[in-house]
């Protein structure tokens, strides 16, 4: 995107982030309107893509949204870059130093309350070390501090919206109904806000969409391909 003006249609959940980026461009002395934030609803996106001044489109988001953007941009033969939803695996092999691996696993999952697109989604553990891994894993997850993300000692904050929290809870329930064992959590706390208790389901339904929040899904096998 170097050398080009940018129009940013940010997630409706966090418009403040986009406005802050725009302000940084302004303070850095870039020409006015070189970077603009569009506070519009998702149903207006096609109008933006169709505009003849827009030469390329990029999206970081869900697979379903990516299909719609690719379809509209493809109709007009516009360049497209898509970074879509996934279920990124984190592999723990039998020679792993668990004292190092477990904190790394947890940090990679609960970053930004699990709502970061680069957060690990699934943790696949070699069966021979599963019990020891789960013991350390659950112990350290249960020690996480849930609360105000502006407080320094908080490690897990709320989800962006209550409906996202409720959807997450339903996904956990469905995993348990399909045979998953909940090693920790699995409940909505009584505290105000869109919080969800740190949760560890084991052997969940692998077909589920990626889970946001402080939910860490584990499974095991005799080799990484299991």
Model-derived features with residue positions:
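Short beta-strand-to-loop elements that line the ligand-binding cleft
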Residues: 36-39, 220-224
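A structural signal for short secondary-structure junctions
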Residues: 194, 214-215
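Glycine-rich phosphate/pyrophosphate-binding beta-alpha loops
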Residues: 111, 215-216
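Rossmann-like NAD(P) dinucleotide-binding subdomain of oxidoreductase/dehydrogenase enzymes
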Residues: 1-100
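Short, solvent-exposed loop/beta-turn-alpha elements that line the ligand-binding surface or hinge
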Residues: 211
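A local structural motif
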Residues: 31-34, 155, 217-219
């Amino acid at each position: 995107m170097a050398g080009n003006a940018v129009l940013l249609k940010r997630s409706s959940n966090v418009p403040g982030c986009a406005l802050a980026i725009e302000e940084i461009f302004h303070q850095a002395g870039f020409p006015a309107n070189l970077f603009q934030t569009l506070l519009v609803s998702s149903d207006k996106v096609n109008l933006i893509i169709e505009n003849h001044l827009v030469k390329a489109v990029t999206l970081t988001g869900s697979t379903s949204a990516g299909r719609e953007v690719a379809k509209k941009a493809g109709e007009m033969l516009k360049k497209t870059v898509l970074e879509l939803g996934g279920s990124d695996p984190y592999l723990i092999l039998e020679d792993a130093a668990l004292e190092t691996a477990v904190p790394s696993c947890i940090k990679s999952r609960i970053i930004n309350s699990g709502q970061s697109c680069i957060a690990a989604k699934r943790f696949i553990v070699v069966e021979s070390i599963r019990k020891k891994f789960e013991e350390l894993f659950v112990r350290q997850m249960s020690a996480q501090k849930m609360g105000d993300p502006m407080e320094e000692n908080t490690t897990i904050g709320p989800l962006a919206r209550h409906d996202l929290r409720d959807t997450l809870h339903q996904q956990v329930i469905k995993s348990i109904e399909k045979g998953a064992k909940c090693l920790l959590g699995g409940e909505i706390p009584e505290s105000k806000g869109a919080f969800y208790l740190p949760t560890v389901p084991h052997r969940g339904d692998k077909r589920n969409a990626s889970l946001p929040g402080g939910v860490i899904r584990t499974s095991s096998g005799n080799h990484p391909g299991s």
